[in-house]
Amino acid sequence: ALPGGFCEIEEDLIDTARRELKEETGLTDIPIELINTWGEVNRDPRDRIITAAYLAIINDMPAPVAGDDACDADWFNIEIRQRGRAKIQKDGKDIINSLYNLKLINRHGDEECTAMVSVKENAKGIIKERKIEVIDNNNIAFDHARFIIDAMLYIDNSIDQ
């Protein structure tokens, strides 16, 4: 699972993200940015959960620190390969449907997690209405693969601008 947890009643979302990052990885004083909010009714098998996903980018990887409710922590290299891309018509709209293979390999190379993720978005217009869905998953928390794909697409789009 990615670092994260629940917001305290008197806590802002960004403060929750910073607290959880510190508690579960030991990282502090790094810039973070909200990239998406996930709130489908049945997205989390535990309960009705709304997730605010934040992105952090760091230059150096300090030793991972597991704390709080995290039993262990590690750094993973991310490999993303676009497996396919097609333009389709749906409800009179041009939709771009992309399929991605995601692979996470820990820094020791002895743990690997994979997923296949579908990304559908409007081909035209400013509002893309991006829908990201996990098609296949191996050892990544239930829908966290789509958070990773979304973050990588966010970075790609930011670099392109």
PLM-predicted stretches and their roles:
Residues G5-D160:
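Unchanged
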